Amino acid sequence: MSVSFIRCNNIDDIISHVNRLSPNLIIIDSIQTIVNTDLDSLPGSPTQVRDCGQRLLEISKQRNISVIIVGHVTKEGSIAGPKMLEHMVDTVLHFEGDKQHQFRILRSKKNRFGSTNEIGIYQMNEKGLQLSL
């Protein structure tokens, strides 16, 4: 297995890389920084997030590729930007915690294929992030 990283925020370039590399997984960090230069709006705007999210959804379905989209959250804990992004995806996960505490919680807010009544508790230690049993 090989891993490729690209530093790119243009959706057309990202799609081109996907078509050339044929990956099994795409991770976008973050959707609010991706831009379609054909649109007259800023990265992170509702128009950009909707269009770029839709383009990622299309390529994932066409090529049977899993896509993980990282997004920003507001201080209140809701997903920043247009709510419709949540409706486009199958699963919404929140990773919660802060530097003052060693534990982090992975909480499911939406799961089209299963329960949202489970959480994962992780601990940050000298080995990195570890599942806490």
Regions picked out by a protein language model, each given a short descriptive name:
Residues 47-68, 72, 88-99:
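Substrate-engagement module of ASCE P-loop NTPases
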Residues 8-14, 74-77, 100:
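Short acidic loop-to-helix transition motifs that present clustered carboxylates
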Residues 1-55:
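Conserved inter-motif catalytic segment of the P-loop NTP-binding fold
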Residues 28, 67, 83:
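Long C-terminal interaction/binding lobes of large macromolecular proteins
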Residues 19-28, 32, 88-91, 97-133:
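Conserved P-loop NTPase
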Residues 78-88:
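Short regulatory helix/loop adjacent to the ATP-binding pocket of P-loop NTPases
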Residues 7-9, 71, 133:
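Short loop/edge segments at beta-strand edges and connector loops
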Residues 33, 58, 75:
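Residues immediately C-terminal
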